[in-house]
Amino acid sequence: MGIRENEHRAANLRFNGKEIQLAVKMLDELETTIDIIYYLMEQEKEQSFVLMLLTAQGVDLNTLLNKEKRETDILFEIDKEESLYVMLCQDTKVDGGYRFAERVIRNIQLDEGKDIFCTELEVRATHYSAKHVILKLLETFVKSRLTDKSNEIVFRSLN
């Protein structure tokens, strides 16, 4: 059976129904935590942070991420069935976030995981709303999947 005409994505449509549901889950899970991190940044107790959105199949991603994370990192299980997780890494800049993602992807591959998609977003300032940050992370992730950037780290910064 072929694709119905209305099932084709319009060029200006960013999220399909499933991705909007995912956005709602991510907003519910992350928004308050990012607001707290923003408070710490404004009090000069934090400088920047990195959000990593990661999925992989054929590996226990929850266990692997819990083993790799630092005490200050916060792990969020967004969708257990889809093996989709967000890690918030406090006091982390581009280099640290990228190296962490490299290590995680290498360990996923060693455990014979597949279909690995990893997007990271560095946040250096508090002038973006938490909602904007979360939706930008998801938008970047969706684009990385559409362009088949499997086994790559797609990294963006918000200044």
Pin down the residues of each PLM region:
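Regulatory and interdomain segments flanking nucleotide-handling catalytic cores
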Residues: M1-N159
